[in-house]
UniProtKB/Swiss-Prot annotation:
NCBIfam families: PRK01305.1-3, PRK01305.2-2, PRK01305.2-3, PRK01305.2-4. Its EC number is 2.3.2.29. This is Aspartate/glutamate leucyltransferase. Signal peptide: none annotated. SUPFAM superfamilies: Acyl-CoA N-acyltransferases (Nat).
Amino acid sequence: MNSNASNTPIAIGISQIFPCSYLDGQQEQLLVIQEETLDPILFDRLLAIGFRRSGSAIYKPRCPRCSACQPIRLPIKEFTPSKRQKRTLAHNRDLTWRITSEHTEAQYALYEKYIRERHFDGPMFPPSKTQYEQFLFCHWLPPTFIEVYDGNRLLAVAVTDTLSNSLSAIYSYFDPDEERRSLGSLLILLQCRLAKLQDKEFLYLGYQIDANRKMSYKRLYRPYQILTPQGWEYSQVC
């Protein structure tokens, strides 16, 4: 594959097969790009064909006998919050939010609490600062942090990549003690708001996995598009 920006060939490798971390009994295999020549312009193009970022590496599922991971994105100019999502926004009107490129100890402390209490049975447990930085940070594309505050207390963080045509939601985490606020939903809605303010065309939400309850929430934000073998298609769900 060549980048139009530099005409530099980009090597695409393939990982070994390993147990899937999302679906029991399935095996996972990834196409992986990890090159010094990667840049935000090329990454925006790779997002459009189903790739994602983890640290400085770009990957896309290429599993032997499974195609459950469906790339999903929101066309921002068409997105309208549902009644439930409007209630979430109204319920959290007392909170403030800000955009920053600064990484802080408070962000990591909240991440550590979130993983320990919400994902103690997953592959990201136990949390560590090294794992956190390797997962979220990228030398060729520093992430943006959307921070949500109750007064001076940090409640939630959305780690987001800012590209020329889109935003890409990398990871979100929040205070597990504030479950009634639906902070996970609030963070997606704030990313939609930011994308609209920045006149972006899409918000990429990663992979929709219908068979995994923890990964099936993304269809609640409509309209959305799913990447199929025929290209990006609007959902037919009413």
